[in-house]
Structure formats: C-alpha cells, structure tokens
Amino acid sequence: MSTNPNTPAPPASRTNPISLRIYKAIGTSFDDVSSREALEIASGMYGPEDPKAKGKAQPEYEELEEDDDTLPKRRTLKGQSAAIARKYLKQDIETCLATGSTKFLEAFAEVDQKLNVLREHMQEMQVRCDQVQSELDQANSGTKFLLERADVLRSQRDSAQLRAHLITLFLSRFTLSNSELTALTSREVTIGQPLFDALDHVEKIRTDCEVLLSGEEGKAQAGLDIMSLTSEQLESGYSKIHRYCQFEFRQFTREAQLEASSVMRQAICRLRDRPALLADAIQTLTSTRQSSILHQFLDALTRGGPGGLPRPIEIHAHDPTRYVGDMLAWVHQTTATEHEFLEGMFGVKEKKRWVGQERGGEEGEEERMASEVLDKDLEGLSRPLKLRIQETIKSQEGIIMTYKIANLLHFYLVTMRKTIGGKAMLVQTLQEIHDQAYIAFYETLDAQGRGLLRFLHPPDATLTPPITLRDAAQILRELLFVYSTSLIDPAERESDADLAKLLDKAVGPCVEMCERMAEMRRGKSGGGEWERDIFMVNSLGYLEHTLEMYDFTTKTLHMLDEKIKTHVESMTFEHHGKLLESCGLAAVMRTIRTRPEDTPLSRLHATSPKSLTSALSKFSTWISTVDPSTSPRLALLTSPRLAVEIHRKALRKIYDAYGEICERVLDKAEGYEFGETMLRRGRDEVGVALGVGEDWELEEDTEEKSMKQKEQQDEDTEDQGEKGIMQEEHKAQDAGNTEDKA
C-alpha cells in the first residue's frame, strides 16, 4: 500500500519518544564551529587500534594517560569504538574536567603564595619611601634659600650670556678682525684681495653705523666713535694703496714691463674714492712714462733697436718721406701700445673698436682718465717731433716732396685724432705741423704759378702745349696721385676744401699762362683768333686730360670744358666763314642778310641771276673737291675728335646756307625766272656730298662716340703707363723702406 509523502503523519506519531529522538537526530545540525570542535575532541579521545599491538591480547578498553595538556584516550578494538564512546563519554568528560580543575587549583595556590611575598616587599618599600620623603622634606626646608639664590644666579647668568652674545655680534659687525687690521696697516702684508675685502668691510661698517647715529644719545656716541675709528682705518688702507701704486708706477720704465695686473687695476679703482691720492699717483705714472717714451724716441732716432736693428731713423734723413714717415709710424705704434696699456690698467671696457677707428658716443670715466694720462705720456714727444719735421719741411724745395710730407702728416693726423681724440696735445702738435706743411706747400705752389707767368713767350708754330705747361701738368698729376692715396672718404673728396684750393692754385696759373701766350701769338703772327683758339684748345685739352684720370676733379673739369667749348664755338664760326669764302657763297649770304626788306634779291648786284649763277657754279666745283671728314686748317688741333666736330659743324652751316639760297631762288617774290635751272645741285645732293644730310646728327654722334672711345683708349694707355711708372717708383721706395726696417 502506497503512502503519499505529502500526507501528514497521524498525530499519534508526534508523541512517540522514538519518533521524537529520530526527528531530533535528523534535525540536529553539526555545521557550526563549536559543534565540530566538540566532535573532533570526542573523536580524539577514542583513537583507533594501534597497529603494533596487533595480535596481542587487549583488554576491553584501556585508559592511557598522556601529558598534562592532552585528554586521555581510550584504545578500542575494531568495531567497539562507537559503543565504548557512548558508554564512557560522560564519565571521561567529567574526569577530564576534574583533572583540569585540580591543575588550575595547584597553579593558583602557587600564584597566591608568590603574591603574598610580593605584598610583604611592597609594604617594606613603602616604609622606606616614607623615610626618604621625610628626609627630602627636611632637606628642602633646609636648602630653600640656596635654591632661591641659585635661581637668581641662573637668571643673571642667562642675562650675562645674552649680553655677551649681543656684544660679540656688535663687535663682529662694527669692528675689524685682527687679520683685517693687519692687512690695512701692516707694511709686511702685500696689497691683495684681503686688503680690498677689509676696505669693503670698513665701508659696510660705516654704512651700518648710520643707524646708530640716528638713535639715542648713547648709541649716537657709539656711532661717532665707530665712525672716527673706521675713518682712520680707511685712510690707513688708502695710504697703503697709494704707496703701492706709486712704487709700481715707477717700475713702468720700459715697454717690455707694460702690463697691469688685476691687483693694480683694482687698486686704481679703489683710489677713485680719494681723488687727491689718485691724482698724485697718476702724476708719478705720467712723469715716469713721459720720460721713458721720450728716451725711447730719442734712442729710436739715434741708436736704433737692440743690436742695431731696426736701424736708427735718422739714418734715412736724406729721404724726407721715409724720415718723416718712420718718425710718425714710431709715434703711432707707441701711441697704440700705450693706449692699450692704459685702457687695460684703468679697466676700460673695449667695444670692439680697432686702433685708429673713430670713437663713438660719450666717454666713460675710465676712458676719460686713460685719455688724459695718454695725453700727458705723449706730451714729451711733441717738441722733438715738431722740430725735426719742421726742419725737414723747410729744407724741401720740390713741391711734390712737400705735398707728400703734408699728405703724410694728414694721414697720421686723421689716424691719431680717431685714436686719442682731437684735444690731445700730440694731436694739436700734429695739427700745427700739418698746417705749416700745407702753408709751405701752397707757398711753393704759388711760387710755381708765379714762375709760369714770369717768363712768357709766344707758342711755336705747331701750337702744341708748351713744355712749361707739360711740366706743370706732370707735377699736378703726381700731386693728384698723392692725394688719391689719402684717408679722405672718396664721397667727400669732391667737396674737400684743400683739394679745391690745390686745383685752383695749380690749374689757375696754367690757364692764365696759356691765355697770355695765346695773346702773344695772336699779336706776333697776325693769326688772329684762329691760332689763339687752337693753342687754347690744345693746352686746355692737355690739362683736361691730366685731370680726367681722377674722379674727384669734376668741378675743375667742368670749368675747363666750358672754356674749351667757348674756343671751339669761336673756331667753328671762323672756320665756317673761311669755308663760305672758299666755296663762293660768302657774298651771296652777306647780301641775303643785309638786303633791304622791300627789294628782291634778283635786283641786287651780288645776287643777280648772273652773279648767283657764277657763285653756284663755283660752289658746285668746290663741293666736288672738299673733304667732308677733315680740313687742313684743323690739322694743328691735337684732338682729332674736336677737329672733326668743328669741320662737320662748319659744313652743316654751309649746307644750311645752301638750303636757304635754294629757298630764295625758288621763291617767286625774289624775281628769278628760271630758278630751277640755276640750281645745278639739289639740297639733298649737297648734304650727301658734304656728309651732313638729314641724318648727320646721328652719324655725327656715332662718329663722335667712336672718336671719343679711341681717344679714351689712347689716353688710358698713356695714363696706365704714367700710373705704372709712378706706382713702380712708389713700390721701389716702399721696398727700400721695408728692407731697411727689416
């Protein structure tokens, strides 16, 4: 019979004890930790059978005692453990509890005994502590006054230590150490960084002391005392620096010793706070260097270098430019060396400026001092240099040598002015010598001009430039070559007053001489204006050719060109008149120009049909024989270009005159019945025959350019030859100078 599991059990089964136990056993859970630990302990109490005891007779069960910390275990036979455990579990557990309690009681009894002993010791220690406290109370009452006194003394000691610390700080801030005092005052300690550090410390003390001076009366008095003491220390330090500088400055007697150490530079920088001491030290330096430089200059003039090299400068006194140039070069080199030495000593911060380069901006204090000292150092050179150069200038008679010396002086004057300034004594001396040299040069140039005008004679038959003009032009060429080597900026040469004065004094007398000679030629030969113009054009052209070599003579060239144009126009007019006479049209043109306004040309004698026919016939014959390129009358002109130009312009005027005659003849108002038959040649035909047709200006420009190019090539060839000669001469002279210097 099947039963439904979901059918509830009958109520009687719930009261059955067996059912209850079964349900209880089934519903009990042993998953909690305490239950599992209890089961593990119980299972440990009843271990399995020992394998070693196998085969031996064992009692039903045996109680085995292990150490105190383990529970007793029962050895059970196979299959009996569960039964024995159920039988003896409660008994075994109670036995274990009893055994454990006994052990606890024994342990606590021993602890109680030890605690009793400890209590006795504590009571004894309490008695001893009470005795000590009693004695301490007695001692405190007996030493109370001493403790109070000790507290007072301790407070006084702390106050004294604080004051001592403050005094130490005050002294360290407002006084110098022994080493610093020694550096300031002792002569045995040399000048160096310790002295400068001590001076800085003194200055700092004086700066800090200003706070004391503005405080209470006592502090102000302390400040005054400190200021007085530090003032003495400062003066002692500056005096020591002053003595050091004076001693060192006296050692600068030779060029090889010119080297300023960093200590020297800093010493001079410190002395700037004492201008009087610095001025006195610098006076020692300037007197020493001035004497040394002067002796070196005199030795260079008379003795030369060590072992005779370089050779003495005065050995070249026979060569003025070499002599003056060597002296000025020595002065310039010495100036550069001295300038570099002084700038290094005074600590001038150089702004990448080369020696001889112009200074820019305002001078600083260091640069101003260096310039002043340099001026005084070189002051001794002024007199011997001036005397020797003046004697050299006075002894010169040649104008070129005088100008070379003057130009050389100008070169070094510009260089020295840029190096040491225009206010320096040496520069002023050079300026004075330079002015005197130019005065002597201009006097010589004036004397040459007067010499040109003193002995005049008429030009020769060739009308070429006279020999005196050629000599003067050669001198002018060399003068301009010397000027071209000067330091004057090429952009400023055109406006240079010295150049304008030179050209005026050199060219003016030459032009005046040529004009006077031309007048003498006109009066002597009776050649009139023609020969005068040819001579003037040749002479002025020669001068113009001399000046064309240089691009800074534009104004003078323009003046000469205007004069040449005037004479060319005069020659063109006269040449045209001569050609007009030779071709037979002169009378006809005079009649056309001077006839009455109301009278036809055919009724006048010179322009009557018969006379005009004869004149035109002569013109036709002349035109077939005339040379359109040149004329024998212009053969004396040295410029082929001008000869062609004058001849072509004259022929052009002949062509224009013939054209005007043609217009008059063909004009019915003039009264010519057969005018066309009278004109044997047309106007264009005449223009072609004379080479001056409608396109003659273009052809003339082309020919003129060709002639100019040819003349320019010839002139360039000649100029290059002349320049080559002058350059070779200068190179030879420079080579000789270099060899002598070497």
Swiss-Prot record:
SMART domains: COG6 (SM01087). This is Conserved oligomeric Golgi complex subunit 6. The keyword Protein transport applies. It is a peripheral membrane protein. Residues 720-742 have a biased composition (Basic and acidic residues). One of its GO terms (cellular component) is Golgi membrane. Keywords: Golgi apparatus, Membrane, Protein transport, Transport. Pfam families: COG6_C (PF20653), COG6_N (PF06419). One of its GO terms (biological process) is intra-Golgi vesicle-mediated transport. Residues 692-742 are annotated as: Disordered. It comes from the Eukaryota. Acts as a component of the peripheral membrane COG complex that is involved in intra-Golgi protein trafficking. COG is located at the cis-Golgi, and regulates tethering of retrograde intra-Golgi vesicles and possibly a number of other membrane trafficking events. It is found in: Golgi apparatus membrane. Its main location: Golgi. Residues 694-703 have a biased composition (Acidic residues). Belongs to the COG6 family. The gene is COG6. The keyword Disulfide bond does not apply. InterPro entries: COG6, COG6_C, COG6_N.
